[in-house]
Curated annotation (Swiss-Prot):
Name of the protein described by the UniProt record: Serine/threonine-protein kinase H2
Residues covered by region (Disordered): 342-367
Enzyme class: transferase
Limits of the Protein kinase domain: 63-320
Domain of life: Eukaryota
Ranges of Low complexity composition bias in the record: 344-359
Keyword tags: ATP-binding, Kinase, Nucleotide-binding, Serine/threonine-protein kinase, Transferase
A single GO cellular-component term on record: cytoplasm
Binding site for ATP: I69, G70, T71, G72, S73, F74, S75, R76, V77, K92
Gene from which the chain derives: PSKH2
Catalysed conversion reaction: L-seryl-[protein] + ATP = O-phospho-L-seryl-[protein] + ADP + H(+); L-threonyl-[protein] + ATP = O-phospho-L-threonyl-[protein] + ADP + H(+)
Family per similarity comment: Belongs to the protein kinase superfamily. CAMK Ser/Thr protein kinase family.
Record organism: Homo sapiens (Human)
Entry's EC annotation: 2.7.11.1
């Protein structure tokens, strides 16, 4: 989950992302002393002990604090273990002393208290104090979307469809409740467990909007992650849940290629590209991608919000209905991984010079997929047109 301008803990995983397995003692051989991993673990234990001391006694009575796994402008996320069941959970601690923190907390809780869906992270219980709110939630331990893709040896269009079915099903549920996520991106799509058949969980509702009882479902707040933001948001127009469908189109493009359809180091140039809505299917692995897959993307990345597919229509698209039956079963994993590495590398601008280590992706690419996270910096509209 996220709030305000959330950021990741380095080198640990993001809020509500997978918690690294507790490693064995990494002490060096022959009395060489502890290695860097052991030192990092020791430092984390000290950090957790200090953090635990500030926890509400009611929380400590029910949960053992295991690790700090994420932080945001108004929050910290820790991995915990329920004392009686030994089941792992995540606790998000929201600081509510300041107005911004209170508003973020109220916004997030207004959504989480309403949702219950197999593809959406579940709020389990809440503890409140004068200055803090503790949200106990499901813990996704299976890793981020692209971490899993790189780690596995094979990835086909059918694998992509299976993922997108779960995401679209979750979005359809949210939209039926008049809830708009407003920050859909790969980092917020987590595997529930490490198993091969794990489901996907939609997480991070820090920017989500819950429709008013009056029936007014339009929004005006300029927020989101720039690479995934819909053009109507940039134009300062009142917008609807169709912004989530634009983001799903961006995610689909990235999932099939390892690249983003709209990308630029300059935020102003990035916004111009989004407003033009022009992208292409050049380079690997696009020649191997089916026409139906591209049609699915094309029906989402439409400038006119009212013409985009809804989540229900996305689930009924022929590419999804047939589970990509007419598509090539070619393994796309190598090309996608290479493109992910290329984008992660600050020195590489071509597939041929892309780095290939998984660790390089883990440390670099996560920051590249959403270089300017959450609430975006406003630019004069005239500069974008």
């Amino acid at each position: 989950m996220g709030c305000g301008a959330s950021r990741k803990v380095v080198p640990g995983p993001p809020a509500l992302a997978w918690a690294k397995h507790e490693g064995q003692n990494q002490a060096g051989v022959g009395g060489a002393g502890p290695g860097p991993e052991a030192a990092a673990q020791a430092a984390q234990r000290i950090q957790v002990a200090r953090f635990r001391a500030k926890f509400d006694p009611r929380v400590l009575a029910r949960y053992d604090i295991k690790a700090l796994i994420g932080t945001g402008s108004f929050s910290r996320v820790v991995r915990v273990e329920q004392k009686t069941t030994k089941k792992p959970f995540a606790i998000k601690v929201m600081e509510t002393r300041e107005r911004e923190g209170r508003e973020a907390c109220v916004s997030e809780l207004s959504v989480l208290r309403r949702v219950s869906h197999r593809y959406i992270v579940q709020l389990m219980e809440i503890f409140e104090t004068e200055d803090q709110v503790y949200m106990v939630m499901e813990l996704a331990t299976g890793g981020e979307l692209f971490d899993r893709l790189i780690a596995q040896g094979s990835f086909t269009e059918r694998d992509a469809v299976r993922i997108l079915q779960m995401v679209a099903d979750g979005i359809r549920y949210l939209h039926a409740l008049q809830i708009t996520h407003r920050n859909l991106k790969p980092e917020n799509l987590l595997y529930y467990h490490p198993g091969e058949e794990s489901k996907i969980l939609i997480t991070d509702f820090g920017l989500a909007y819950s429709g008013k009882k009056s029936g007014d479902w339009t929004m005006k707040t300029l927020c989101g992650t720039p690479e995934y933001i819909a053009p109507e948001v940039l134009l300062r127009k009142p917008y609807t849940s169709a912004v989530d469908m634009w983001a799903l189109g961006v995610i689909t493009y990235a999932l099939l290629s390892g690249f983003l359809p709209f990308d630029d180091e300059s935020q102003t140039r990035l916004y111009r590209k989004i407003l033009k809505g022009k992208y292409n299917y050049t380079g690997e692995p696009w020649p191997s991608i089916s026409h139906l897959a591209k049609d699915f993307i094309d029906k989402l990345l439409i400038l006119e919000a009212g013409h985009r597919m809804s989540a229900g229509q996305a689930l009924d698209h022929p590419w999804v209905i047939t589970m990509a039956a007419g598509s090539s079963m070619k393994n796309l994993q190598r090309a996608i991984s290479r493109n992910l590495m290329q984008r992660a590398s600050p020195h590489s601008q071509s597939p041929g010079s892309a780095q290939s280590s998984k660790s390089h992706y883990s440390h670099k690419s996560r920051h590249m997929w959403s270089k300017r996270n959450l609430r975006i910096v406003e630019s004069p509209l005239s500069a974008l047109l």
